[in-house]
Amino acid sequence: MKRTLIVVDVQNDFCEGGSLAVAGGADVAFGIAEVLKRWTDGEPWDRRYDYVVATRDHHIDPGGHFSDHPDYVDSWPPHCVAGTDGVAFHPNLDPQPFDAVFDKGEYQAAYSGFEGKSHDGVPLADWLRGHEVGSVDVVGIATDHCVRATALDAAHNGLETTVLLDLTAGVAMETTAAALEAMRAVGVRLQGEPIVR
């Protein structure tokens, strides 16, 4: 059984200074980069992961997902718009040794990385199956939105799923606590504590 690290939405617009910033996002990007450095520098026989993939919000025209008067539940300020700097991975996330990147939300709201497709059109679930992945660790932004949705979908797809909470940032205490409970309820393993400021 192969193991994969899924890096969720560590993008400029979700880090400090971005249009939908999550406090602690830049620190999470740096922490994930440290894991990626150890992975790329490690001996092939001593690597913790067989693959590392990333997801990105990549909005072209997501309809009602964007609003000038967002409710921050179903509608949000414009963010991660294709062709802008906001869609790029945060500079603290270096290196970026991704085996594949899965873009989501081009024309509709999308939270889970499992709603994304690689540049050659392969959905994340199919990519993982094709690479014989049975176990995933999930990290990224935000604990209470896209990390939660990705972890839940990973579990629903039969993957042994762990969220490395020290490498996640949540929007708010209340929604992060609810996300942790939802993930526990479907058997997702939780390690560490999320950043929530």
Name these PLM-found stretches.
Residues 1-105, 160-163, 171-197:
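Active-site acidic carboxylates
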Residues 19, 76-77, 111-112, 137-138, ...:
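Short, contiguous strand/loop micro-motifs
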Residues 29, 121-125, 148:
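Short, well-ordered alpha-helical scaffold segments within catalytic/effector domains
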Residues 35-36, 145-156:
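Histidine-anchored nucleotide/phosphate-binding helix
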Residues 46, 83-84, 88-141:
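Internal catalytic-core helix/loop-beta-alpha segment
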Residues 61-64, 110-111, 147:
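Short catalytic/ligand-binding loop motif for oxyanion handling, primarily in non-cytosolic enzymes
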Residues 107, 142-145, 168-170:
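Short Gly/Pro-enriched loop/turn and capping motifs at secondary-structure junctions
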Residues 125-138, 151-172:
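Long, low-complexity, intrinsically disordered polar/charged segments
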